[in-house]
Amino acid sequence: MPHFDCLIVGGGHAGAQAAILLRQLKFEGTVGLISGETEYPYERPPLSKDYLAGEKIFDRILLRPRNFWGDQGIELFLGERVKALQPAEHSLTTASGAEFTYGKLIWAGGGVARRLSCPGGTAKGLFTVRTRADVDAVMAVLPQAERFAIVGGGYIGLEAAAVLSKLGKQVTLIEALDRVLARVAGPELSAFFEDEHRAHGVDVRLACGVEAIEADEQDRATGVRLADGTIIPTDAVIVGIGIVPETGPLLLAGASGGNGVDVDEYCLTSLPDVYAIGDCAAHENRFAEGRRVRVESVQNANDQARTAVQHIIGTPAPYDAVPWFWSNQYDLRLQTVGLAVAHDERVVRGDPATRSFSVVYLRQGHVVALDCVNRTKDYVQGRALVVDGTRVDRDRLADADTPLKELTAAQG
């Protein structure tokens, strides 16, 4: 039975970064990493962008060269999924029957793409965009498929729509809510991206629930039936409706949690010597008014990896990183800092018609987040306003010619 001083579950950004940091910070114990995927750790953001577009080959999105892991004394177990955890024994079992013991365990299981639960939801020709295998499957049908229906108007759906539109495909994007990005951004940003996608030929359908997937005699998807009975003919369907956190073994072993596994400020779960980081970790975040949230981003994965590793090596520092995120669509670069979940006011800097503007989110007059489209200077300078929760003068904030670094606290 292999034993590791630190065993990591998950080969995504969080798990890989934890392994990298253990060695960078001179952890001398044994390190193992178990991943359900058969691939060496790789970047996920390019999957719905450059990789899907065929602009980057897989080797260019590897997080490290293949020989790095062995050279660093990090043992990889690829294609293995953890089935059960025995916290009292500090051991776990994989689906193949392999058993491991550990001193410390870092759970970076991430999540699996959420599937449609409607009739026809298991038909052939339905795809997700979560793993390399997912995107390879989409790319395999590109030569034959001309009509794509994308279910979900979040970032994954919008990025996939942009790539497919640029490839000359006929794209219909279906969103259940009344605007895209409704869960993460204000209506100004939603309207801007809706207009952009329509200008590029995407048929954007809002407030449309999916009733069923139509399929032929071979159980291959031929259309998406909406709640009002409308059928969108399609050759392929991409489902981008979020993820389900991969935390089953932890919760079954008694860890606290629900939508994710609960962690404290050092990324420790309620189980002894077990940490959780990345997409699956529900933590209290001061940028969300102290609410317990899961943040699905590379930033969160990397920063929580550092928090867990520093605690393991005896230099603890509580997690307090400012959230940030980016999205590329067409020739647009969106950069986000902070969390807009609890804002009560928005100020727009610049004119969206120029395709260069920012939306600043306030709570009781204090800056809590920014969405910046083709406006990197606002993103860079606005970060400090978010970190400090700066109270700003709204008139100066709305003046696009006033650098954010010059804003001073409003009086009164």
UniProtKB/Swiss-Prot annotation:
Disruption phenotype: Disruption mutant shows growth defect on DDVA.
Binding site for FAD: A14, K49, V82, R130, D279, V298
Reported pH dependence: Optimum pH is 6.0.
GO molecular function, a single term: monooxygenase activity
Coiled coil region boundaries: none
Temperature dependence: Optimum temperature is 25-30 degrees Celsius.
Keyword Iron on entry: no
EC number: 1.14.13.-
Bilayer-crossing regions: none
Cofactor binding, note field: Binds 1 FAD per monomer.
Cofactor(s) in the UniProt record: FAD
Subunit structure: Monomer. The three-component monooxygenase is composed of an oxygenase (LigXa), a ferredoxin (LigXc) and a ferredoxin reductase (LigXd).
Family affiliation: Belongs to the FAD-dependent oxidoreductase family.
Reported function: Involved in the catabolism of 5,5'-dehydrodivanillate (DDVA), an intermediate in the biodegradation of lignin. Part of a three-component monooxygenase that catalyzes the O-demethylation of DDVA, leading to the formation of 2,2',3-trihydroxy-3'-methoxy-5,5'-dicarboxybiphenyl (OH-DDVA). LigXd probably transfers the electrons from NADH to LigXc.
Protein name: 5,5'-dehydrodivanillate O-demethylase ferredoxin reductase subunit
UniProt organism field: Sphingobium sp. (strain NBRC 103272 / SYK-6)
Gene name of the encoded protein: ligXd
